[in-house]
């Protein structure tokens, strides 16, 4: 445990959990809450299971956010995303749940999640979802119109 930040995962032995668990997510105080950086996080090895066939689905997850008072700790995010490994859920549901879990944890000014999933049967699924506080609704609408 990192005492000054009260983080459990960073610097500790890593037990990998492969069942969905939002409690793995951790945050730390934003050192510059007066700035509005757009932070991009990319997970190139996201895996979940198809809820119908139980076959693995592979994708790249992009998370972009403008923090308010808290920022996500990256190792906890990695462990959280790995926890989807044996979780049966459709791509769209995974993306929505990731957004909701991060919004609950961070209470950001703006947050978006985009999934670029490997094709199945010749069709690629690329869900996008975003969230914004009142003051960032215009930014949210523009991002939605220009979603990747």
Swiss-Prot record:
<dbReference type="Pfam" id="PF14489">
    <property type="entry name" value="QueF"/>
</dbReference>
<feature type="binding site">
    <location>
        <begin position="91"/>
        <end position="92"/>
    </location>
    <ligand>
        <name>substrate</name>
    </ligand>
</feature>
<feature type="active site" description="Proton donor">
    <location>
        <position position="57"/>
    </location>
</feature>
<dbReference type="InterPro" id="IPR016856">
    <property type="entry name" value="QueF_type1"/>
</dbReference>
<dbReference type="GO" id="GO:0033739">
    <property type="term" value="F:preQ1 synthase activity"/>
</dbReference>
<keyword id="KW-0671">Queuosine biosynthesis</keyword>
<dbReference type="GO" id="GO:0008616">
    <property type="term" value="P:queuosine biosynthetic process"/>
</dbReference>
<protein>
    <recommendedName>
        <fullName>NADPH-dependent 7-cyano-7-deazaguanine reductase</fullName>
        <ecNumber>1.7.1.13</ecNumber>
    </recommendedName>
</protein>
<dbReference type="InterPro" id="IPR043133">
    <property type="entry name" value="GTP-CH-I_C/QueF"/>
</dbReference>
<dbReference type="GO" id="GO:0005737">
    <property type="term" value="C:cytoplasm"/>
</dbReference>
<comment type="similarity">
    <text>Belongs to the GTP cyclohydrolase I family. QueF type 1 subfamily.</text>
</comment>
<keyword id="KW-0521">NADP</keyword>
<dbReference type="InterPro" id="IPR050084">
    <property type="entry name" value="NADPH_dep_7-cyano-7-deazaG_red"/>
</dbReference>
<keyword id="KW-0963">Cytoplasm</keyword>
<dbReference type="InterPro" id="IPR029500">
    <property type="entry name" value="QueF"/>
</dbReference>
<comment type="pathway">
    <text>tRNA modification; tRNA-queuosine biosynthesis.</text>
</comment>
<comment type="function">
    <text>Catalyzes the NADPH-dependent reduction of 7-cyano-7-deazaguanine (preQ0) to 7-aminomethyl-7-deazaguanine (preQ1).</text>
</comment>
<keyword id="KW-0560">Oxidoreductase</keyword>
<dbReference type="GO" id="GO:0006400">
    <property type="term" value="P:tRNA modification"/>
</dbReference>
<feature type="active site" description="Thioimide intermediate">
    <location>
        <position position="50"/>
    </location>
</feature>
<feature type="binding site">
    <location>
        <begin position="72"/>
        <end position="74"/>
    </location>
    <ligand>
        <name>substrate</name>
    </ligand>
</feature>
């Amino acid at each position: 445990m990192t005492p000054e930040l009260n983080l459990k995962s960073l610097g500790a032995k890593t037990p990998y959990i492969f069942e969905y668990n939002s409690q793995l997510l951790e945050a730390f105080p934003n050192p510059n809450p007066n700035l509005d950086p757009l932070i991009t996080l990319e997970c190139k090895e996201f895996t979940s299971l198809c809820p119908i066939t139980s076959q693995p689905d592979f994708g790249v997850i992009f998370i972009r956010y403008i923090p308010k008072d808290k920022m996500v700790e990256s190792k906890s995010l990695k462990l959280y995303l790995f926890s989807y490994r044996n979780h049966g859920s459709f791509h769209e549901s995974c993306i929505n749940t990731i957004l909701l879990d991060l919004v609950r944890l961070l209470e950001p000014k703006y947050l978006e999640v985009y999934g670029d999933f490997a094709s199945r049967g010749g069709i690629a699924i690329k869900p996008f979802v975003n969230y914004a506080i009142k003051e960032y609704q215009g930014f949210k609408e523009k991002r939605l119109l220009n979603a990747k």
